[in-house]
A protein has these predicted regions:
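Terminal-region recognition feature
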Residues: 1-137
Length: 137
């Protein structure tokens, strides 16, 4: 049986989409490093945890986690070295059996300094918490 033009087009589009998803996943991996490996190592050498590590310890083990706004600040503030995730990590997760919004400043991004996008992301986290009747930590 011959392959139809629609099937060929579908497969072509599927391949393009898979490539785009993979590129997005790679970019997310970079963003999740915050200010970079060097700053993470510096934090660890001082006996401190990153924002994502602190959040992971706070949340119930095995519960679903949804990060919000991972690409906030992406491509912004290049003149200042960038602002991955807006300098703040926001997740919806479960703490002691209760779904919560958790916000943690990322000290690897400009030592935790705030950019305008940081404030916007914090406000959005508060709005999400209020709209969904979730406690915010």
């Amino acid at each position: 049986m011959a392959v139809s033009q629609k099937e060929i087009e579908f497969n072509f589009n599927e391949d393009k989409m898979r490539l785009k998803i993979r590129a997005l996943e790679k970019e997310l991996e970079k963003v999740q490093l915050g200010g970079g490996k060097k700053r993470i190592d510096k934090l660890h050498s001082a006996g401190k945890l990153t924002a994502r590590e602190r959040i992971k310890q706070l949340l119930d083990k095995g519960a679903e986690i949804q990060e919000i706004g991972a690409f906030a600040g992406h491509g912004m503030y290049a003149e200042y070295g960038g602002c991955p995730s807006g300098g703040v990590v926001v997740v919806i997760g479960v703490v002691s059996g209760r779904r919560c919004v958790v916000v943690a400043n990322d000290a690897t991004v400009k030592a935790g300094a705030w950019f305008p996008i940081t404030g916007k992301k914090n406000l959005r986290a508060q709005e999400i918490a209020m709209e969904n009747h979730l406690p915010i930590i």
